[in-house]
């Protein structure tokens, strides 16, 4: 696996090694020791799976402390534009925005650490799976509007 830090501190794009032949493919999506060596030393305790029609925006979601969540995100069908915002007030990239294309064809994954808001737009019908470092907690649920004027995010679709 290849681990690449992106424009926001601690945001990591992961490119897995895919073994493909005429029968199909195999890849390892998570290995605690490999991730630890790649700079991601967390414990995932919940897996989620969502399905969205083309053009759907989900997010920007986050949970308040002490229920913050880190996430490992991948598109298992279709493609998404994944959008994250750094909400860590003491971070050098505070309020920074990153956009990453995740596609079921290239199988890249995105690690979003605790302290970020997360969302995505489905560029086609898609399924997205993500691992979380904390359980969902309804009382800690929060979010930022997708069209927040301060962030001014271009979701790269017509009529969001």
Regions found by a protein language model. Name each.
Residues 1-106, 130-160:
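Non-catalytic, conserved peripheral segments adjacent to functional cores
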Residues 102-124:
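Conserved metal-binding segment of the jelly-roll/cupin
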């Amino acid at each position: 696996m290849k681990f690449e830090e992106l424009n926001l501190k601690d945001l990591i794009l992961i490119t897995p090694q895919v073994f493909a032949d005429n029968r199909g493919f195999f890849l390892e999506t998570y290995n605690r020791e490999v991730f630890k060596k790649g700079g991601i030393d967390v414990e995932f305790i919940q897996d989620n799976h969502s399905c969205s029609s083309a053009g759907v925006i989900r997010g920007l979601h986050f949970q308040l402390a002490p229920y913050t969540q880190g996430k490992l995100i991948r598109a298992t069908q279709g493609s998404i534009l994944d959008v994250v915002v750094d909400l860590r007030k003491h971070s050098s990239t505070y309020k920074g925005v990153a956009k990453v294309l995740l596609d079921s064809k290239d199988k890249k994954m995105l690690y979003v650490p605790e302290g970020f808001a997360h969302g995505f737009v489905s560029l086609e019908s898609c399924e997205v799976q993500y691992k979380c470092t904390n359980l969902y907690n309804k009382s800690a649920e929060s979010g930022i509007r997708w069209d927040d004027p301060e962030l001014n995010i271009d979701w790269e679709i017509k009529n969001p």
